[in-house]
Amino acid sequence: PCSLIYPWNDEIGLSNARCLPIVYDLIRDKLTDQQIYLAEKTIEAYALQCEERLDKLDFTANPGDSHAGRVPAYMGDAALILKGSAYVKEEVLMRWLEKALDIYGGIFPFFGTSDGGWAEGSFYSTSYTKWYLPFFLAVERFSGFRLLDRPFYQRVSQFFLHFAVKGRENHPFGDGYWCSSEDPEWPGFFAQNPFRVYAERFGPDLAKRWEREQAAPE
């Protein structure tokens, strides 16, 4: 039921693939050898499912699948965090890392067709511009290469100003729904301040102000 590659709902698997490598990195020093083995083989299993899903879709040629758009970062996180593992082959880690970097250095972010803009639209953008940030920032920290220097990332906080501010009514791309802090959907889709990182680095003064004032999720 937690698989990323079977026809049933993949949300649990996506969350596991995202969180397990990062949590493991934080607690590894507290684990026994057996626990390290189990954790690393579980992370490997999820990263292999990420890779299989991308390969089956031929993602670089067909990047429109929303959920698949999350997993290159999770695969990249696994590659970085498992570096030096005694249980996962280095050539496998290098393959995952190269695929993630090819996607984020090549076709990403992908754009929609008839909507004429970013494929995920306004509602999903509050979360879908966050999934890859841990991987981007790790690459930047360890290599100095800034994936965030692309124009999309430099300007996305200006896009948020049109709808991700209290009282704004502009819902582009036909989404028609916005999530406020009182909404039950808030924890899932607005789990993080959408201005964070983007406004801090690239935003105009108004975006930086809203980054500071945006209500924190409960």
Show where each model-derived region lies:
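Aromatic-lined, polymer-binding surfaces characteristic
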Residues: 1-164
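Carbohydrate-active enzyme catalytic cores, enriched for enzymes
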Residues: 82, 124-218
